[in-house]
Amino acid sequence: MRRMIPITIMTLVLSLLLTPLAFAAIPQGQEEQEEQEQEQSYEETVVVSASRFEQLLMDVPVSISVITGEFIKNSASTGNYADLLRSVPGLNVTQTSARDTNMTSRQATSTLATSQLVMVDGRTVYQDFFGFVLWELLPVNRDELAQIEVQRGPSSAVWGANAMTGVVNVITKSPRAMGNWTSIRAGAGEIGTSFFSALQSGVRDKFSYKFSGAYYQQDPWPRPSNFSGAAFPDAVNRGTAQPKFDGRVDYQINQDSNLSFGGGYTGTNGIIFTGLGPFDIADGSSASYMRADYNNGDANVRFFANILDAESQNLLSPLILNFATGTYDFSAKNMTVAQEGKHVLNYGGNYRHLTNELSIAPDGDTRSEGGVYLQDNWAPHEQFLINAGVRLDTFSSIDGAVFTPRIGMQVRPFAGEDHAIRVSWGRGTRAPSVINNHLNTFIFNSLDLSPLTPVLGFNPGLFAFPIFAEGNPGLKQETHDQFEVGYRAVINGKVSLDFAYYVSETTDNIDFYTDQYFTMFDPPPGWALPGFILNFLPALPKHMTYRNIGSIKNQGMELGFQARVAPGNEIFANYTWQKDPEVEEIDLADVNLPPTNRFNVGMAGSVRGLMYSAVVAYQDEAFWSDVLDSRFHGVTDKMTTLNLTLGYELENINFSVRATNVTNQLFQQHYVGDVIGRRVVAEAGLNFDWDNR
């Protein structure tokens, strides 16, 4: 049953919204008044994720949220993106272990969220071999983040396959924008949390650079009780340890062109949850990348390589998953302005080659894909904007080309005013992963037979049985169509309002299902009891595979509010409503159900050296059915979290205390996930701006 948001939470919401107003009443010195005059207003917010080139947010006919670098700096999040991105409307976020985070736009997420593309400065970190994102492998330092852009809705017409339900683009500051800068940061706290980071940037004539290193570790959250009759060994849940190194060097050839080179390394370990059950990623698992860019005006040519090397052990069965993958991508893009700015044409393409060594999919050793796209932003009138685009992709794993169009229109009903009504339709796709196509392994599961003791006269204990899991090379791509109507307004540059209503349908869903069960006439290997007993037990899977099936229809609404109540101080609130999905040719019991209601409210900023943030997040219960069989399916309770930051900044040094889930409400964000509680950490930092800016 869906419950109302508690009155106490609403009281806290009002308190959070009203508190910053007191700051606005403090008399300001000349310096603060100048800062307020220079502070960027909401109508000046620029994004790049909507069309792969810089646009004012007010000119984008799709739903995009922007998390600013200032908000990131003040947030309670120290080591995971879940606490940070949960405040975005329309984005369902789950944390299932100390290191495992998943998120999906405008539909239920899962243990392996496959439909949301995640990038760092336009470089994908999506793992094509399994179709998921390892968030902790983003090799970026908090101090170098410029902003995070979250586009909700199909983005394949711009970014290609796997941007099916949306895009998260983590954008970092360039070395030249950072200038000559040094930062050192360290902290420690509850749940065995400790972290250290260092960042150095500099500018030397035509050269600019930045280098960073970091280390983060945390003990495990508690595992849930043995609710399913299957073993959940506690000893292997070791938390996580994550070293990171990253670097970038730019060379300014002339005013219009430059070269940029980057590379990084990230290590990880800890629990990752999949449809095959939880795996423990071993020590020494790592990801690395290298990138080279040439920019000339609006033209860009890029090459990047992502390398992943990891080993893992399934916690429910003796299944080893070792994966060594390489992604090699070459892309080019350009932009042309025509008819005195009425048409802005954006076009380009890419070719990608993947190599894989997968212990559970030995036949999926290589894959290639390529695509081209064309976008046109047409402004026939100063109050009317049309965006249309199309992309064509080919995959070595899919017969025929994949066509993804989109179109959007935006009207500003009042000349000279920042009010915009938008209507858009778009299509997104997700290509089958290598595992979807080529999985070939046995999963050893277990069933607790001890309830049969009174009948049998002895305790049969746990019975282990094999399930053969097999891929399907004939899978088609998933297709996601979405229609959206929305409204965006900026009032006096200081207040931003946003509304969106959408309906969507995902067809040819890639579903991992059981197509054969053991029976009394075909019992599992090693079954020593009478065969008829199987008729009184939960059905035991014999064979599992993937299929394209049916459709899932979603609809929902999002409301957003932001306001700058004083220089550097902001309050926000947003609400998300998602209707339970409607399904065809699929049993609703086999579909994850997202929370119906989600609500976020918060504030963040700094006043006379005092830095703070406070965010309350509420969400309803959710249903999960994406892991193995019905023994691992169930409902997670509604939850309310309060995250707080309080600190003080001097000229070159700062101290802060950052707390997540302050009230220590114990909850699971997925039915098989860890039990998440409170974490409080203390942090100290040194910052040196050698340019005295």
Where are these regions (language model features)?
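A beta-strand signature from Gram-negative outer-membrane beta-barrel systems
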Residues: P139-S183
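Extracytoplasmic beta-strand/coil segments of soluble accessory domains associated
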Residues: S49, L56, A82-Q127, A146
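Membrane-embedded beta-barrel scaffold of Gram-negative outer-membrane proteins
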Residues: A214, N300-N314, K342, R352-T355, ...
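Gram-negative outer-membrane beta-barrel transporters
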Residues: F261, A379-I386, D498, Y502-E505, ...
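Short acidic/polar hinge/loop motifs at secondary-structure boundaries
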Residues: T124-R152, A469
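Structural signature of Gram-negative outer-membrane beta-barrels, strongest in the C-terminal barrel
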Residues: N254-D256, G262-G263, G267, Y289-Y294, ...
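Periplasmic-side early beta-strands and strand-to-turn transitions of outer-membrane beta-barrels
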Residues: A157, N169, R176-G179, S183-G187, ...
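Flexible loop and strand-edge segments within Gram-negative outer membrane beta-barrel domains
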Residues: Q218-P222, R238, S257-D329, S359-I360
